[in-house]
């Protein structure tokens, strides 16, 4: 059975069950008293205040007899919160459409003029991102009209940040070799770092002095900070995360799930038709 989040649902339960107790109290009054109340119009008396202990007892009794109500309340609250989050994310996507889909600073795989776009926020040290790399490759190979944008989003410590600085500098200097660099570093068994990223960069023909000079350019750090800000606005806090159409998709959900969402965007403009 799912665990209950009492901090979320206790206030709701108190209000709901309190109302039930209030109604139950008056429903239990003798029929004669109810009849008298209905026929007596001259005197209007306020109903007696319910004792707090009575309310608490009624709530406790109801919850013990109907514990499934708490799961229903929790599910309803979570669904309401998710709906609000999706609405906020859709608005953020609309407001930041150019920065998300068409930033000239971002590496792009596939067809730069494709009819549909997938945007991925990733970290080179993210295990699920490594697993999801095959999904990207499969989708691009099977869909010549797909544009795949990569958002360098180092969130897993200083090693990740250093590796992404190397990656962005390499992309700026050697854009033709960047796809090989990306696949090799993301597929690397060890930890991505300045050292491992630079080793791959030089093996692909990059000049370390030029790369380090480019890494020192303030624009590299500014681009990463801009990605952090964009992720925050979209409610993205983990990797991998995707933006497809008007939806933020979190987690390595697999090629078939992503491809279905792309197909729906082409068909009706939304990930769900």
Identify the residue ranges that each predicted region occupies.
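A short beta-strand-turn-helix
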Residues: 98-116, 140-141, 273
């Amino acid at each position: 059975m799912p665990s209950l989040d009492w901090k979320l649902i206790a206030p709701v339960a108190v209000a709901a069950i309190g109302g039930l107790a209030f109604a139950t109290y008056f429903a239990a009054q003798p029929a004669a008293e109810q009849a008298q109340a209905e026929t007596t119009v001259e005197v209007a008396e306020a109903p007696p205040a319910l004792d707090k202990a009575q309310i608490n007892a009624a709530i406790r009794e109801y919850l013990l007899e109907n514990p499934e109500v708490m799961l229903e309340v929790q599910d309803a609250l979570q669904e309401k919160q998710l709906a609000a989050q999706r609405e906020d994310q859709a608005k953020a996507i609309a407001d930041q459409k150019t920065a998300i889909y068409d930033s000239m600073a971002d590496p792009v795989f596939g067809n730069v003029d494709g009819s549909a776009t997938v945007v991925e926020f990733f970290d080179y040290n993210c295990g699920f991102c490594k697993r999801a790399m095959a999904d990207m490759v499969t989708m691009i190979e099977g869909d010549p009209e797909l544009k795949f944008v990569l958002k360098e989003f180092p969130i897993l410590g200083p090693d990740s940040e250093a590796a992404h600085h190397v990656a962005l500098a390499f992309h700026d200097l050697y854009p033709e070799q960047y796809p090989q660099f990306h696949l090799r570093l993301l597929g690397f068994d060890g930890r991505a770092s300045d050292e491992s990223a630079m080793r791959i960069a030089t093996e692909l023909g990059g000049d370390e002095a030029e790369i380090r000079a480019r890494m020192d350019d303030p624009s590299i750090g500014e681009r990463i900070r801009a990605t952090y800000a964009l992720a925050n606005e979209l409610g993205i806090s983990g990797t991998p995360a995707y933006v497809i159409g008007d939806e933020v998709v979190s987690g390595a959900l697999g090629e078939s799930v992503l491809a279905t969402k792309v197909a729906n965007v082409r068909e009706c403009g939304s990930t769900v038709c």
